């Protein structure tokens, strides 16, 4: 049977589901808090004016592209630390965590310089008002200063979650969300003696929140008794380039996968633009809701990475294979709920974004397509995270590149323009590309996990 799902009893299945839920739920809530921070930025910038909102939209797109790509690179720490934890290598867990912080700091500084360098070309490329371009530049400058803290935070995030302590990540994320509200209010509108920075104030608030999050996680880990045996904060460790090389080897393909997926969805918006504003608005509704729902398989997948890595560290290879299957089944059950939610409640969901009749009509149909691709999207996401637990990241990268850019964009363009399917041609191609990615990744996971079990039985 696929991934040996019939190997263990139903009680073992329920136990694994409970363990996955205990890890996934706090991670999901932490992501909700992070999305809430972006929502507050949008509301506050919109309150300052449409030009400020436009500046934040442009600046945040640049920041998000760098942040998401680098976040993928830092995700290499999850399987590394989880496997060491499962193997009982306490000292190596702490040392790998320290090297992760160093790596994150260097990567963040590189990201900061990259964003600085991008400001002038962005301004030269855009043909907007001086105010929008200037506010965007200020926003990018402030958020660039957040990059070192953001990557250190991701290192600590990976450390805590890989040691089965996602609750503290959730608490820090909600504290950051709460802090972001008054900071935005103060910096955007100029309260308590501060100058009114408009949309740029959102960038300053983002910088402050990321530095707070990194510092809060560090203090929490330093004070919490559970973490003391690992010694992350007990001593100072010099950068180890051998560990850096390992992080890069595992993480670079993950980062590129994130970039390929995010850029493909972003590029489709530009290809839809000739159909008119109503179609672009409807597309944004579909992508926004799909992005929110995508947090669910991401959380299940992250929990699966930790559980699989831990089991591999304990040399429980059959268990790791079984957990891969349980993760997928859990995702499929949740996907059914999301499909029904999108199909049955698509009208009220769309009306939350826009009340224009033309947009409502198009977006309601778009959500039907979005509902259809949920099972495939959940599957490909969780399967790629499971493979990450085995430290297999290059193959998923190639699969994502072929699926999203080869099977998604080009066929989508042909269906939209040559076969007159319009916006729905792109969504049809997305469903096909996600299905292809899901099948390929599950098959890869089946072969990888089976070979791991077989090779260690032969020893």
Swiss-Prot record:
Q: What residue intervals traverse the membrane? A: 20-40, 53-73, 100-120, 132-152, 168-188, 202-222, 252-272, 285-305, 325-345, 358-378, 395-415, 423-443
Domain of life the protein comes from:
Bacteria
Q: Where found, per UniProt?
A: Cell inner membrane
GO CC annotation, single: plasma membrane
Q: Please indicate if the UniProt record lists Cell inner membrane as a keyword.
A: yes
One of the GO biological process terms: monoatomic ion transport
Q: Which UniProt keywords apply?
A: Antiport, Cell inner membrane, Cell membrane, Ion transport, Membrane, Transmembrane, Transmembrane helix, Transport
Does the record bear Nucleotidyltransferase in its keywords?
A: no
* GO molecular function annotations of the record: antiporter activity; xenobiotic transmembrane transporter activity
Q: Which CDD domains match?
A: MATE_NorM_like
Just give the chief location class: membrane
Membrane topology listed for this record: Multi-pass membrane protein
PANTHER family cross-referenced by the UniProt entry: FMN_FAD EXPORTER YEEO-RELATED, MULTIDRUG RESISTANCE PROTEIN NORM-RELATED
* NCBIfam families attached to this UniProt entry: matE, MATE_multi_NorM
This chain's function reads: Multidrug efflux pump.
The family assignment reads: Belongs to the multi antimicrobial extrusion (MATE) (TC 2.A.66.1) family.
Q: What is this protein called?
A: Probable multidrug resistance protein NorM
Species for this entry: Neisseria meningitidis serogroup A / serotype 4A (strain DSM 15465 / Z2491)
Recite the lineage of the species: Bacteria, Pseudomonadati, Pseudomonadota, Betaproteobacteria, Neisseriales
Q: Which gene encodes it?
A: norM
